[in-house]
Amino acid sequence: MTTPSKFRDIEIRAPRGNTLTAKSWLTEAPLRMLMNNLDPEVAENPKELVVYGGIGRAARNWECYDRIVETLRQLNDDETLLVQSGKPVGVFKTHADAPRVLIANSNLVPHWATWEHFNELDARGLAMYGQMTAGSWIYIGSQGIVQGTYETFVEAGRQHYDGNLAGRWVLTAGLGGMGGAQPLAATLAGACSLNIECQQSRIDFRLRSRYVDEQAKDLDDALARIARYTAEGKAISIALLGNAAEILPELVRRGVRPDMVTDQTSAHDPLNGYLPAGWTWEQYRDRAQTDPAGVVKAAKRSMAVHVQAMLAFQKLGIPTFDYGNNIRQMAKEEGVANAFDFPGFVPAYIRPLFCRGIGPFRWAALSGDPQDIYKTDAKVKELIPDDAHLHRWLDMARERISFQGLPARICWVGLGLRAKLGLAFNEMVRSGELSAPIVIGRDHLDSGSVSSPNRETEAMQDGSDAVSDWPLLNALLNTASGATWVSLHHGGGVGMGFSQHSGMVIVCDGTDAAAARIARVLTNDPGTGVMRHADAGYPIAIDCAREQGLNLPMITGKR
């Protein structure tokens, strides 16, 4: 038996147009989105199946990828494919409204939910890290997090700077699949940004895709550019090659005062995602094979230094927040007792949106035609005519965001509006206004689909941060409601042992059957977010539940 391979020198792109390569659009859609996750315009390291986030993969190995593709092409519309940590393990007879694919990635019994145990399983070919949208086949490149990052920066501007970020600058690090959204989000919010990244290839990627505007040659040059652009009120993003664990302490030593500090390095995965200070990337990858425990220790030591610098900025009164990569936890484990003195971005800025079921609604055009996305942009404006903030986002997205792979759009909307938009998109497919079906999905980072005490569910007012029944219920309800594919993952965003989360995708193929499924899924999915926050006692969520007619027996009293 040949050894399964995680490397293949190949380029993959999803088919375009309206010609099927599978038996229906319900199986063509997951096939194209799986391939799109591995498009070289989309994935961080597609030849090793890595989509984003350290080692977040789309399939366990290339043999599994081949068999998934083969199976999806043969799958009937009354069958369901089961995928276990990136490996296709079964096809079962179900029914037309059941999901065509059910995915479980990286899930471990809690006592064994550690990176050490996971890495052992991964090395033996028994597991795969799915991150959030890597293993659930709905990653759309950095755009997928741009609006969430933009909303965070805008809200921080409202809270700290009277809603005006002109002449202000953000200090951050990480230009990978997620962190790469930061420079563009800051620019769209009106601020300059200094973005530290330890790999030149990632800086080059963001420069090519226009997510970052310029690269400075060194720290002095970067600070000179920041000073010039902030004085002129220009929102320009600057990349700097270097190590955040070295540069942030130097900025503190120099007395430099950013206007906002955060971080989006892959600190959740010390073995694969965070370069120790003083090391080259080549040393880091080589030693990860020969001395993984030593690498983890060195990376976490550097994270501790990084967080201490962030704490120093906070002590100066500078708004400082964690952007969900678990760096505070890593620093705390290295002895930084007050690592959690600065907040995470969700309790600080995003939770009121979650209380209304508002989160990262996204869709992709299976046709590959950008015009299909532009037509849906116009439909969103037509159906939501009075939301100037949303209209501004769509205008900026069209102007500044380069599509990666299949054209796609991210748009934060909540309960009520998601179903309205989904049904409208389905009608556009039916009428021929769109040239092929649309898939609608979301990040697992949503209001009802994740339990993550150091990120999305940090500081819940009832203390239910670590209760993970909610994403399980979300996945079960989306399955019962007829989503086209449903996923249930562990460890995304913050690493092993720190999160559980679920995802869903539904196809708009223009049929009546699709319309019925869309109405159920795109109501019930955000409805679980309102339910979860109402159950925790948030008045905004309770009011939303009543306004939207949710039947929450312990809260709304509806029978």
Curated annotation (Swiss-Prot):
UniProt-listed Pfam families: Urocanase, Urocanase_C, Urocanase_N
Cited InterPro entries: Urocanase, Urocanase-like, Urocanase_C, Urocanase_central_sf, Urocanase_CS, Urocanase_N, Urocanase_Rossmann-like, Urocanase_sf
Keyword Lyase: yes
Subcellular locations according to the entry: Cytoplasm
Keywords: Cytoplasm, Histidine metabolism, Lyase, NAD
Molecular functions per Gene Ontology: urocanate hydratase activity
Entry GO terms, CC: cytoplasm
Listed GO biological process terms: L-histidine catabolic process to glutamate and formamide; L-histidine catabolic process to glutamate and formate
Cofactor details (free text): Binds 1 NAD(+) per subunit.
Cofactor: NAD(+)
Catalytic-site annotation from UniProt: 411
Catalysis: reaction(s): 4-imidazolone-5-propanoate = trans-urocanate + H2O
Enzyme nomenclature, EC number: 4.2.1.49
Pathways per UniProt: Amino-acid degradation; L-histidine degradation into L-glutamate; N-formimidoyl-L-glutamate from L-histidine: step 2/3
List of residues binding NAD(+): 53-54, 131, 177-179, 197, 202, 243-244, 264-268, 274-275, 323, 493
Family matches, as PANTHER family: UROCANATE HYDRATASE
Functional description taken from the UniProt entry: Catalyzes the conversion of urocanate to 4-imidazolone-5-propionate.
Cited HAMAP family: HutU
Protein name listed in UniProt: Urocanate hydratase
Originating gene: hutU
